[in-house]
Design a protein with these regions (language model features):
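Extended amphipathic, helix-rich lipid-handling scaffolds
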Residues: 1-48, 54-112, 137-208
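Assembly/interface hotspot detector across virion components, adhesins/toxins, and nucleic-acid enzymes
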Residues: 125-127, 180
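Short, T/G/N/S-enriched strand-turn elements that build extracellular solenoid repeat scaffolds
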Residues: 53-54, 125
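Internal alpha-helical scaffold/solenoid segments in large eukaryotic proteins
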Residues: 116-119
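Extended, hydrophobic alpha-helical segments in both membrane/secreted and soluble proteins
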Residues: 121-123, 210-214
Length: 214
């Protein structure tokens, strides 16, 4: 199955997510209601990725699935959702357990394991195509991350004053027990939560002064 340029848009109210191309190679076992994917590839301005895995079709009584549950393994990912970054951010790969409901559209991720520079970011959440637009609710956690990588992954348009202060005033820090949350509702600015523990902090404490360690 090969598709040219198009967009994911569950309804007229949702902002379309465009893609340049997509393709998939798969086999289907109707007795088990299972699809085995040897390849799923997507190229778009939001990102590029290649995956493999399997999916189980649910609610086939009408001859068309109401939902599917899937487990996928994803190779290297280059991501830039909604143009949040100056260029694509590259990750080593990922694995995911997910459920896709078609009407109304809802993508639920039970466990998304994103590998990045020897660490693993675990995400879960749901994206819904509502009658008034996209709704997103995502939570994540990570054991540790280098502070410079945190700033690379923190979009400059989200909490820009906090991000700038950290970038300009934190000279060194060891981060652990990172928690992340993103909530988005139609017509409202996204709400970002970031929590973490830290040690070995070194920071500027006045505009023209020295530094303090903690």
């Amino acid at each position: 199955l090969q598709i040219g340029a198009g967009a994911l848009r569950p309804n007229a109210a949702t902002v379309p997510i465009p893609f340049r191309s997509a393709r998939s190679y798969f086999t289907y076992d109707p007795k088990r209601g299972q699809i085995d994917f040897s390849e799923i590839s997507v190229e778009s301005d939001w990102g590029t990725a290649r995956a493999e895995g399997r999916a189980r079709l649910l609610g086939m009584e009408s001859g068309w699935p109401a939902a599917l549950e899937a487990q996928v393994r994803i190779g290297e990912i280059a991501a830039n959702p909604a143009g949040l970054y100056p260029g694509p951010v590259v990750f080593e790969g990922a694995g995911a357990d997910l459920r896709l409901e078609l009407d109304p559209f809802a993508l639920t991720v039970g466990d998304f394991r994103l590998r990045d520079r020897g660490e693993v970011l675990r995400l879960s959440g749901v994206a819904r195509g509502q009658a008034d637009g996209w709704s997103v609710d995502v939570s994540g956690r990570m054991e540790t991350i280098a502070p410079e990588r945190l700033l690379e992954l923190w979009p400059v348009t989200i909490k820009p004053k906090t991000r700038t202060w950290i970038d300009e005033n934190v000279l060194g820090i060891a981060l652990h027990d990172i928690q992340f949350g993103l909530r988005g509702e139609p017509g409202r600015a996204p709400d970002l939560f970031l929590g973490f523990g830290f040690s070995d902090l070194s920071t500027v404490y006045v505009d023209h002064g020295g530094a303090v360690a903690a």
